[in-house]
């Protein structure tokens, strides 16, 4: 089922900013359409296009965990910043834009720009007349612009980004806005003109080069961007792509493109009595496919779209593993798009040699651990070390592997991917843990992202609830994995038994650490990991219920002053954990109203100055879009310990409204379709993709199915009573 029309992106132009642009993407290329119609700008990004080079001085020789522990215990903030945070201020490594095109010769004046999510085709029109249609071919690094005959004379030009040559004076940047592209000393671009093609090839560093080309064929214009190890290869491949596109023709490319998207949208759908939540969900699913294509680089902070404002992207467009990557890839499984999300898991798996190298070089341990702020090769970028170099963030990456198994039921993946990844991570963490005076295991230093920023107070008394929840999750899940693979040993259980329980205050719930409670509003609910996303505490357990209620109530009491965009989706999840659909709906509406650009991009701060938080900047990051979609799904479907419940957090206002969804994925690959009519008739269909048994909470029965089998149920409210 295609997305409803109200989920399309409809804008009135001229569009003044790149972060409000019409976003096209295919997981290989990303393009942003913006500016005045007569000089339409098309920003072009290539997935995985990075300048990888590191400064000659590289990382300080004291860039080690042992040194970090020493400085933390001394309270030496200045030296900690010098060694561990300063590297992030260097301009490279960084994600970079590929360039932009300018389409000239179209009429002046205001216009209507529309992106049809169902087909991923954008159209620009004036007074009801379509002037331009454009799409990025799924499966090919090719964009197509289609003009009516009246605008055959329109022209396309290509410009490279405003990279510097290393001689210009540039302003100092910061982590949010790292400064001008002029900081990047790159050689001049090589012009490309051959067989009607125009563009350029750009050498980046010893491992990076790319070519951006376009060609006009009557009323159709094609463009491509290809990266390779060297300029010669990039140029050759780009020319081959354009020739192949021209040979196939725009209409055939469009037919293939539309078929791909029709199949994609057929994987899952939903119909809600709330257009805002529908829009959040469908747009997030569009952004997922537009930014994450099997065989290509996974989405960094900005997904498939790099900044096009002559500056480095916010936070360098890097991979933040202390929340951002995990939230970016949190909703895809329930949405039944495992292929798009597995891109990130394949990427993490490919980085295992780097993770082992970093564990040895930085932590001085066996096993594997990636830095929490890293470049595309898994190299440490630096940053606040309490979080950018926290070893427990690696466990959150482990959870992503287990979630893939949990929601697909793929036992081979469990054996060949999940178990080795968990075991290698545990080998690193086990060496870092030390036995305290009470016999409990603690880390040498502990923190809770991003509490107390990078001040001395950010080092909490070990173990913080953030670290502790993740450690419990790691060793407890390893026990489960061994049982699931038929090889229980008891080793991991013995380690978990030496971890202290979570620190709890009767008034405020989960604490930051054994001796500190959260006293002020804060964006990162890291102390509440045990509730969401680790789901270790269960609301049906009376003891857990009191902890969950106290924790969430305390966060509400402290207010949203220091929240950012992702905080609202996270709070929605915390409300869902206690079946508070009204609370979840409230937070998701606040997020949608105050933190989204008009094209659906999450801009992180209250950029409209509405008063919902104290941050009024607008750096674009995409993880909060996916987190909001995840919350929408959790309102509709709960799947834990093979117990399936539909509408576990239904808002009061939906009680007499139609609600439906199709093929949302539950545990062990069970696909759930559900419908409730306005007169409260319910229908539920479950389809197994793996053999298994599940308990259906709404019908109070177990169902046992073989792969491919389905079972349907109908009931009314009276029958339910």
Regions found by a protein language model. Give the residues of each.
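Aromatic-residue-lined binding/catalytic grooves and analogous aromatic/hydrophobic interfacial grooves
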Residues: 2-380, 441, 483-559, 593, ...
